[in-house]
Amino acid sequence: MVAEISKDCVTIAAADQCVDMKEELPAGNYILVGVDVDTTGRRLIDEIVQLAAYTPKDNFQQYIMPYMNLNPAARQRHQIRVISIGFYRMLKSMQTYKIIKSKSEVAALMDFLNWLEMLVAKQPSTDGIVMLYHEERKFIPYMVLEALKKYGLIERFNRTVKSFVNTFNMAKASLGDANLKNCGLRKLSLLLAKSNDESANKENEPENVNRNGSSNDKCHKNGMNQEHDFFEGSANVRAKMVYEVALQLTNSDRTSEPESSEELVNLFNAVKPFAKLVSSDIMELQTQNENMGRQNSFRPVFLNYFRTTLYHRVRAVKFRIVLAENGFTLDSLKAIWTEKRKEGLELALTNIDTLKTEEKTELVELLDSFFDPSKATIKPSFKPNGNGPRRRIRANGAASSKNGAMSSRSTSTEFGAGGDKSQTEGLSAPVPDSTTKSPSPGKTGGRPHRKRNNTRNGFGSAKGPKKAETLNIAAPEPPQSPVAVSTPVAIAATN
């Protein structure tokens, strides 16, 4: 559920809803490359963690060390997290528990551009590269272009890469919306390959029976490697799957690069209607940055929504996106309300078709209560569940009691300056790291320390006080009068 919220937070419209016919990709000989990225989140301000590209003859994969940490949804999706050992930050795989070799963002982008130029150099007759990606909401081209824009590498990128193509629109045109509902990239690949696999299995059924015995033994040995190789959360795996889906959508039985010129022409003809030039994507990126500024202006209005339940947070995100895409800002709506009050807000929102009638009513009431100083800002009503937090505390307590030694050892070494610390939220006591000062032993709330024995007085040992009490009871000491201190007198010498 967290992943859905963070995905909706991206202020981008549905992917490739319209194709600009003025900037159409010209006919030519192009190299198709599947591309995908792993990011720290689903916002334009997030960073790339892994950049991957695939062709049947060569592929590119590089992990990037981000400045920010991965959010919980990204960590769960990509199985990667940021750890800190001392003053060094690094990436660690949550599957293999090994440190991942990474580079800086600018170094990884330079290697990526060199790899693309090498592909073009190997085929002098080519006209450029067409990148394939698969997403329902357009995000990958924006992230790649935003990263290149920071270092002034867009012109060099545009000389090699000519267009981006979303294979989701290709699948939508061939299969329809009903078949693509809740259909991920792997499920789509299996759906397209199902008919071809069934026909191939019927023809080669005797051979498959003889090979089952030897293949089963290898599957047990290479089980972990296969799970890692087919992990859909990795950009390297998804880039390969994107390329294979594009071939399957063109009714090609092959899962590798077509060799004949006729097959290349058929593949390009299938891709061309959905291709958009890089220049148009750059203009869209600029528009999305402007929408982000409009969306951020509505944060004070929906502050109470983000402090409540998941339902209201998703609803607030939807309202902010719709208002920003329609060109509204908080200042413009305030000017409308100042002039015509609530009726002006209703007229301004009537032309928005993406909102239902009850949603428009709720939004108008919320804006009116925010702008009117005599009214209190509307707070969404919800029923808190008293059993939920209690069960979580018990579950966390049981887990911490069983795995206390292991968790304390791992967190103390892997969570530090700038590392991911969200896993320590369920612990009762904070885990010390390089950014926090560890408390002294005398101030801890654990078992009290035993005092040292003092052998100089009678109260040092455990039996000392008892002996003193018996002596005082048997024969109490008589009171002593103060003794006068005599002063020394000088003696005179006589003859």
Swiss-Prot record:
Coiled coil: none annotated. The gene is exu1. It comes from Drosophila pseudoobscura pseudoobscura. GO terms for molecular function: protein homodimerization activity; RNA binding. InterPro entries: Exu, Exu_RNase_H-like, SAM_Exu. One of its GO terms (biological process) is bicoid mRNA localization. Keywords: Developmental protein, RNA-binding. Residues 207-216, 398-414 have a biased composition (Polar residues). The keyword 4Fe-4S does not apply. This is Maternal protein exuperantia-1. Ensures the proper localization of the mRNA of the bicoid gene to the anterior regions of the oocyte thus playing a fundamental role in the establishment of the polarity of the oocyte. May bind the bcd mRNA. Residues 197-217, 377-495 are annotated as: Disordered.
